[in-house]
Amino acid sequence: MNDRELSGEYSWDNLKERAKELNCLYQVDEVLNNPRLSLPDIFRELTRVMPSGWQFPEVCKVRIVYGNQSYQTPGFRSSPYSCLAPIKQDGKPVGQVEVVYVTEVVKSEEGYFLDKEMKLIRTIADRISQTILHRYMEPVLREWSQPKAQVYEGR
């Protein structure tokens, strides 16, 4: 352990970052689980809530690409300070989530993005993938279960 790891400052900073990431994930789950939102509305809302989970939210921007559409935080622009995670369906990429810092930020030992932030973006992309699948399967399951219900009622 180095001196900073032993100090309360490191522990407190580390805890604050984990709390931000966890709160971000809670907000993401609330958005993804809102049945009133369409997929485009979900993507727009996610670009609004996601920056709060990163180390430098004031310069953090998000873009979600799905199919031919792109949804992004106002002020988003390509940056050398970015991380990406694919949105997949059937194991194939159908889009991506991109988080960027639009200005240079302090580079830690882990890089411009913390390891936990890299895990966070992958988790969010995975949850988006699950939500898309769920949204497409809902009508199929409803249709599939309806005839069965009628058959059982007829007995």
Language model: regions and residue ranges:
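Amphipathic alpha-helical "output/dimerization" segments
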Residues: 1-3, 7, 108-131
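Signal-transmission linkers at sensory-effector interfaces
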Residues: 2-31, 97, 127, 134-155
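Interdomain signal-transducing alpha-helices
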Residues: 19-22, 46, 50, 91, ...
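Helix-loop-beta substructure at the N-terminus of cytosolic sensory domains
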Residues: 25-73, 154-155
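Short, flexible helix-adjacent loops and helix caps
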Residues: 33, 37, 76, 102-105, ...
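Signal-transducing coupling segments at domain and membrane junctions
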Residues: 67-81, 103-116
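A short beta-strand signature within small-molecule sensing/ligand-binding domains used
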Residues: 78-87, 93
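Sensory-domain boundary capping and coupling elements
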Residues: 88-105, 131
